[in-house]
Each structure stands twice: as structure tokens, then as C-alpha cells.
Amino acid sequence: MYITPLFFPNLLKLQRKSFLTFLKYGIKKEIKKLDITKNKKKLLVYPNLFQLNLPTYTCNECVITSKTYNCELVIPIRLISYKDEIEWITLTNIPIMTNKCNFITNGSPRVIMSQITRAPGIYYHKENENTYYADIIAERGNWLRIEIDKKNNIWMKVKKVPKVPALMFLQALGVTKSNLIKLLKYPIPNQNHNLGNFKSQKEALEKIELYSQLESSINSRNLKNQNKITIFDRFMNPKYYDLGTRGRIQINKKFNNIEETIQHSTLTSKDFILAVHFLLKIKYKIEETDDIDNLKNKRVKIAGELIQSQFGIGILRLQKYVKDKLGNIKNNLHLTNIFSSTPINTTLAEFFGVNPLSQFMDEVNPLATLTHKRRLSSLGIGGVNRDTATLTIRSIHPTLYGRICPIETPEGKNAGLVNSFALFAEINSEGLIETPFFRVCNGRILYEMGINYLSANQEDKSNIVPFDIKKSRIGFLSKNKIAARIKQQFKEVSKKKVDFISISQLQMLSVATSLIPFMEHNDANRVLMGSNMQRQAVPLLKTECCLVGTGLETKIFFDLQDNVKSPPNGFISYLSLKKITISNIRNEHKSFNFKSNPLETITCIKSKSRNFNRLKYNLKDLLTNSKESLKITNYMSYVREQKIQYYIKQYNSSNQGTCSVNRLTLNEGQFIIKKNPLISGLSSCRNELALGKNLFVGYISWKGYNFEDAIVLNEQLVINNIYTSTHLEKFETEIKKNKENSEIITRDIKNISFLNKKNLDKNGIIKIGSRVFSDDILVGKLLPIETRILSPYRKLLYEILQKQNDHYRNTSLRVPKYKRGRITFVDYIKDKGKIKKKTEILKDLKTIKIHLMQNRLIQIGDKISGRHGNKGVISKILKIQEMPYLNDGIPLDILLNPLGVPSRMNIGQVLECLLGLSCFYLQRRFKVIPFDESFGFEVSRNFIYSNLYFSNIKTGNNWLLHPYYPGKNRIFDSYSGLPFDQPITIGKAYILKLIHLVEEKVHARSTGSYSLVTQQPLKGKSKKGGQRVGEMEVWALEGYGAAYTLHEILTVKSDDIKSRQKVLTSILNSETIKFGTTETFKVLIRELQSLCLNIQFFK
């Protein structure tokens, strides 16, 4: 039994579930912590009665007007001993997750990544041969370390505090020496040092130097008391220290401490004694150390929990703020004066704006968006540091199977620290990642019992076998002896001892990795590159489904919810590019009880047009008495004629500047089923994810143009717009207004020709649909300036040139250099929101936003890639008559270097292109599940050869499968018309165009800023930097003998300060450029002089 995409869980289920838990229980839990008492005044809060008001703006309006999509949290509060009245106070504005599982803050879609950290509890490690230590990790509070060093001394360490003897610390807490020796049971090494000679608790406190940094500020009299209070506060006061429920459970399980209750969230003296006791057990080889990289010792915080912890910090800040207010205000006590939403609002704004886990949503394509929401990071507050993270943290652990994808991770510093959830991964109530298995009993898979989710801890106790072992159709395991996994090791066990089996061969993979066909034939490094590069694929103008897929393309398309779906069954009564109307029959209202609800009292809310697709109708909405209601006399006629309208936005922009064009996929009058997609948008085709194009590929070197991963392309791909992508650029201009002078929006601008103003409307703003080029006016603006008093000479000059004294300066918004395209959107925003009518334009207008859409053809320098990590840059675009062609005259679309396959070990690309060739001639598409070798030996190769053989027979093209060199064909040279000497591999491969476009990379520096330290030009396009001429570039110029060019590059174009200021004057006066001394040379001399070498240089 194979789990098909129909049985896959929703890929965004984890994020939705977490945020809903926060709204239902998290808010209530944090508000309960609000305890405000000051000067006999107490505020009573009712956390169970909190309410969330609906958002003021829709998601679309928030994006346009740069606002945050949030809802108001109100709560009833009563001030005891003042008035008995209950007042509703606005506590904060909570950012709300959209139906696409992202947040909108200040108009920008953002994603909160999940964080994986060490679970709270105690963990034992071995550092060296004779050094052991235990780390006690809390949810809130300092980490504590207890260690035994080489000299058998037991120490206790806290960050930024000197270490103290651990047993002395216990004596300071009140445990006597005799009790310690009894409780520990095992012989204490180096007793004299560890226990000391203290007669009382006071002496132990005096000796401890745990808080030595406070000694200067504390009097000698209060030192004992202060030490005792500080120790208590550090680990035993709930205000400063919290183990959390999970931490307490873990410690109790570790020490078999049944007596300690779960509610006790701080450390006790008994915990310290048991911790030292267990450490001695490890010292004497009775117990084993913990594996901190095991997933049973890590827990995951998803968006809801991260926001909840931040909300809790805001509650503490609010508590402090209100207490200060209560202490200061004596008269006119009013809750609105005491309470403010600012403390919590600023805390949440900090989290969404500054926290590294809150990131701009990656919207290059739907796969990038989905993967970004399923990301799992070890970085951030409470996580690891990327600079100090060791190889063990980054490496693959056996417990990752089915929980975290071992392949998909970034290249570079974040490798192994940022991962993705596996397809079937779930999070339980304790924050542990679980993965599903089928139960096996006596060698038979119990499909009828459903699936069992196991955490890493539960998995250790069971014998588990992979999905791809041999089994019968009804679920009996074939072999008597099977290789099973138990406690992270493989052992051969009897089939009757097998407890669980995986549910799918895709179980260990992430979303992006599972889209790569034949990925099991590739090197893991190349699969990693393929997974990452699919997320960089630009949406194309003409989309096309892949001929060879894996079956998950449809699942991704439906789970993202970017596409408009129909909620009811019905037929399309009206269809246009802007609006779709669906008429349907409301079957659910046929059972309506007319006796208890007379028809005269039934009212229906007037239909309002909405911009969003998640429009839900229920009985409560229909039967609401409101001002905007319409009385219905015939209920059944209303039921039959109900209509739902969708308003479609044709062009959708993204954070990365890509653009999708929404297309209609249905016809007027067509009957549609519930959840049927109505439009095809970003990177989608036939309800599937479509990122690239199927091209005829040939693995042949061509005149050196495809040397080192360079790619040769057919010109027809440019002419036919095969790889043309749409990009949207946003322009914004603010209308400056002040008391003295304000900018004026107008069409009447002097010295501007009619051709430059023809696309402006009567107000001076560009019309939608206009085609604009570089330096064209988008918004005509004039700024009044003071009239200058002209001198007699200037007056005479103005009269001769017939020029008038200007009263205005032209401040119009223009199209930047080298940009052109079509205007798709113009929006007018005033101080208090969006302007709805064009008659209001000149009143209170604050900002104008304009979207410019441009089509970018593929060109030399663009980066393209396959799905197997086979990437390259286009080096040559050949005419169709110059490309090699097949036996039936079809020219190849793309030429790849054959040397790129054996060294990279990504054979999957060859298998894909050969199967794609048979797809083209058989007019079929194939879905190939990764790890298909489970169905038999060499299944992939046999399947491809059999399909090539079928296509050979069906089409009569005997050259498709040659008996002597199967998979290769003879192709013809376009210049001579003769076949090449050797047969080559040709096929159909799915090729992607990546966002690394040459148009955005090419940059030239004329003048720009210099670094203050080195006095050399800065680097980078954004800083208008220069191109670094390094050591090897200098050698190249030396090889050509270009002495003067090299001299100029290393001096006046670099850090010769005095000479570079005189270069322009020398060129204009036709003088010889004089070279001075460079700053680099001066630094070298200073370095040598600092070594006491008397080196001087003379002019």
C-alpha cells in the first residue's frame, strides 16, 4: 500500500494549529499572570472573558496601505476599592495569521520560522577521559553546570560567575554534611576539598563566592543574607527561574523522583543532591551519558508558542507600567489613564521586526513560500550561534528519519542549522517531533488500525523496518529475517519481532526534495542543490507541467491556497478577468425549521463584494437582524438564486519582485464542484506546480562554449517567449506638505513636450495600461520656490534667451534609467487610509503607489538549472539553423557539457531526460516515486528502456532505442548535415530559469564612495562599488604587458588620494597624469618601521 498524495496531511497544518492554540489557550494563560497590587489598590482581571475584534482592514488593504494585519484584544478589568464598575480595556493589537499562514506587518508579508532548541531538563556529558559534567537547562533562567574535573573536585558553574564547590553550595542551602554523605550513597572523591570543614550553614554562605561581583556594593554586615537571597532567587524563585512542565517531567523521569509534583517549576535542594548522585554514578560507569543531538532531547517552538512567549514578556512590561502609574496617580483614578497598549504592542513589534526568526516571506515561487513556512532553525534567541556551532550539531542524526529532512539545508554558514520538516512530521503537546508508522503484528502490517505517531523517545523501544522491504499485497512481510532499526542501530531480527514499518518511501524527505524524480541515483550534495534551486525558479509567462514528476506537484498547488477555490457547488453565470460570479443551490437550508422561524422574520445581509477567496456562508450570517438587511418574502426563491462573486487581481506582486499573471481556467456556464480552482496563477498549470519548461537536451560539447558548466541555448526559446518571466517593480512618491509651501500634482509642466505627457491623466498621474520607458514621467509634481531677485546682467541674459524667472521646481517622479514596462496598478493613499473615489484625489492626498510590470527575456548571463543540481550560465544563444538536430529534424533546445555528469555523480538527470524523450513520443506523462528500487532490481533503468522500446514501436522511429548503445542517438551537425562521429545522450529535461538574472547583476562604477579605513572603492552594486583587481588579475595584466593600465588601476583608481582628485583636471587640460603615493604603500612602510627598520621613501 502506497500513501498517495490524497492521504498526505495538509503541509501548513502545523503552523495553523500552533497559532489557533495560542489564540484559544495561550492568551488566557499569559493574562492570568497579570497580578497588579499597589498601595492597597488591586486590579482584578478576567482572562476568561477576553475578546478579539475583527481586523479593521483586509489583507490586501494592509499590503497597499503599509499597515499591519491585526485584531484588537479587549479584556474586562475592575479596580477594587475604588469602583465596582467593570471596564473593557484594549490590551494590545495582536498580528493575525492569514489563511496562507503568514503575517502582514507594515504592509510586508512575513513568516515566523519554527525554532528547535534543547529541551529543558538535565543532561550528562563526558568531556575528557576523567571529566564529566551535567547541564541543567531551564525554560527561563540561567543554565547551571555541575562537573567533576580531573582532580575529582565537584564544581558548580553559572555563566559570568566564578565556580564554587558543588557540595559546599548544598551546605549553604541547609543540607548538613552527615546528610550529604548518607544521601549520595556512593563514595565522594576528594572529600576534604568537596565538603570542607563547615560547622553551620552560615559558614558555608560566607565561603561561597558565587556573587563576588556584588561584594563592592554590599556591606560586610549584609553579605550573608544577600548571598542567601541571591542563591534562592537564582534557582528557587519562580519570578527568576522556571523549569517549565516539560523540564520538571524530564528531571523526575531521570531521577525516578515520583514525590516531586509537576507544578513545582523551580529547583529544590533534593534536585541538586540527586544531580550530584547521578553524576557520581556516571563517574563510576554505572550510568551512561546523554546524546544531546538526539531529537528526544530537543523540542520545537512553532509560530504560536514563539508569539506567546513574547506576549508574556509584554504582559510583564505592562504590569510594571501599570504599577508605576498606580503609585503616581492619587486623584481621578480611571482605568483608561492607567492602562496603555504600548508595552505589549512594542514588544510584539520588536519580535516581528528584529527577531531573526521573523523573516520577509520568500515569494519567488509557490514552492519557496511553502518551504519557508516549513523551515526549522537552530539559530535565534535561546539557540546556537552560527559562528561557534560545531560539526556534531550540524551533522545528520539517526533520529531525524521521518522528522527532519537530512538533505534540504542551505549551503554555507547555516548548513545543518536551518532545516525543513519532513513530509509527514507532526508536533505533539510536549514540542517533540513525531513521525507516522504502521503497526506490525506477527509479520503482518495492520493497515486497518491506522497510523501511529512516534517520537524519538518512543521509537528507541521498538523494532522498525523501512517501507521498501519486500511484502505481499495484503501486508505480510516476505522474508523471515529482516534488517530492522532499534536504538539507532541496524540489526537482523525475525519478522515476528518487528513492531512498526514506515508508511511511505517519501517519509524522510521534505517538500522540495520529494519533487526531484530519480533523486536516489544522485549524490546527496547535488540533491541539496536541486532542492534549493527549485525555490529560486522564476514564474514564467507561459507555464508547462513537467513530463516526469513525482506526484506531489498537485498537493503543493492545493495546500498553498494561492489559487481561488469555489466554496459551493454551482455553475459560472458570469466570467471576466476581474470578476467571477457563481450561482448555486443551498442544499443545507432545505432542512430549515419554518414553524419556529416565520418567513417574515427572516432577513439576509446585503451581499458585499470581497477581495478574498475564503468566503464562508452559514445560517447565522443569513439570519441576522441588522441595519444592512433585506427582507425576503420567498425563502426558496432566494435559495435557488444565491450568487457569490469573486473579484480577481490580475497581477500579484511579491517581496522578491516577481509577478504572477492570473489566468481563467474555466468557461462561462460550466458546472464546478466545491474547492475547484477557478484561476491558474503563480507557477501553476493544470492544477499542478509548474516551475520550468520541458526542453530537448543534448549532452555534447560545442566549440568550447559549454566549457565549465556554461550552456548553449536555441534562439527559438527567446523568440517564442519560452523563458520570458514577468517582474513587478514598485514606485512610491510622497506629496510633501508644510506650512510654507506644498508640492502640487499637475499635468501642466513647462518645458515638457506633449509626447512626454500623453500618458498622464488630467491630474498628472500615469494611466493604468500605459507603456513607459526610461525617464518618462509617472507623477507630475511641482514644488513652489521663492522668486529670485535678478541682477541686471541676468535680466539681460533672460531677455536674450527668452527665458522666464521660474516660480516652481520640477520634482516629478520618473522611470529610472534602463527600466521600461507597462503600468498595471496606481493607488492613491491619504492620511486616514485609502482613497476610493477619483474625485477625492486632490484632497488630503499623501502617497501615490505605482506598479511597473516588465517582461524579461532570457539572455546571455542568465542562470538556469535542472532539478538535479545541474546548474549553469548561458554563454551563447545560437540560431535555430546552427543547432544540432535529431533524425526527425527536431533541433535541440539546449546543449550541456557531458563532463558535468560523471564528476558530480547526478545520474538522475540522464534518467529523467531519457524518460522524458519517451514521454514526448508516447504523448504521456509519468509520476516516478523516489526510491523505486524497492519494487525490484534496476527498476529505473528497466522502466526507461521499456518505455523507449514502446515509443520505438509506436512511432516507427527505430533510432530511439539502439541495440548497441541504448539511451544514445546519432544527431546531425547543422553546418555539414552529417551525423557526429559518436552517438550522444539526448532527451527531454525539465529546466528552470533562476532568479539570478544578469540584468540585476551587471553593474559599472564611474564615481562612488571610498572606504574610510583603506581609502579604496567600496564593493557591491548597492554601494556603487568597484570591481576588485586581485593578485591573479594583476598577473593577467602583467602577462599582456599592460603596464600603464595596471599602474592606473593600482594608483589613481584605487587609493592614491591626491592624484585621483587631480585626474579630471589633467584629462580636461590634456596634461600628463601625475601619480603619487598610495595609502597601501604608506601602510607597508609603517609596518616595517614598527619592526624597528629605518625605511624611508623619497620623491
UniProtKB/Swiss-Prot annotation:
It is found in: Plastid, Chloroplast. CDD domains: RNA_pol_B_RPB2. Keywords: Chloroplast, DNA-directed RNA polymerase, Nucleotidyltransferase, Plastid, Transcription, Transferase. Its main location: plastid. InterPro entries: DNA-dir_RNA_pol_bsu_ext_1_sf, DNA-dir_RNA_pol_bsu_external_1, DNA-dir_RNA_pol_su2, DNA-dir_RNAP_su2_dom, DNA-dir_RNAP_su2_hyb_sf, RNA_pol_bsu_bac, RNA_pol_bsu_CS, RNA_pol_Rpb2_2. GO terms for cellular component: chloroplast; DNA-directed RNA polymerase complex; mitochondrion. It catalyses: RNA(n) + a ribonucleoside 5'-triphosphate = RNA(n+1) + diphosphate. GO terms for biological process: DNA-templated transcription. Transmembrane segments: none annotated. It holds the Pfam family RNA_pol_Rpb2_45. It is an enzyme of class 2 (transferase). Its EC number is 2.7.7.6. One of its GO terms (molecular function) is ribonucleoside binding. Belongs to the RNA polymerase beta chain family. DNA-dependent RNA polymerase catalyzes the transcription of DNA into RNA using the four ribonucleoside triphosphates as substrates. In plastids the minimal PEP RNA polymerase catalytic core is composed of four subunits: alpha, beta, beta', and beta''. When a (nuclear-encoded) sigma factor is associated with the core the holoenzyme is formed, which can initiate transcription. This is DNA-directed RNA polymerase subunit beta. The gene is rpoB.
